[in-house]
Amino acid sequence: MVADTDAQAQRIADEAYPRWRDGMDFLWRRSNLDFTLKDIYPGDFAALQAIGHGIAGSPATVRDYLARLQAETGVNYVLCQMVFGSMSFEQAEQSIRLFASEVMPAFET
């Protein structure tokens, strides 16, 4: 999730993620089963970020995170879920636009 500021991106992600997470474990709950992916997809976005499975921030924060990931692992591509949970169209559009215009160019070769 990319927004103009770290605080704005974090707020949007914190609000949107629970709805997405609820949908992820719906079938497990419906079948009275334990959600087996809870370690990969914890209950809130802060926990998701803490284990390195999510990022929300300004373009600079997201760019720095991806550059660090690339330097540490040699990764040459990432899969991004740009829209999730209860994000509005406007929030999603802004995130995608900022990612395309201010994050991606840093990784073009």
Question: Where do the PLM segments sit?
Answer:
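An alpha-helical appendage that flanks or caps ligand/catalytic pockets
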Residues: 1-75, 108
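C-terminal helical cap(s) of enzyme catalytic domains, especially alpha/beta-barrels
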Residues: 91-108
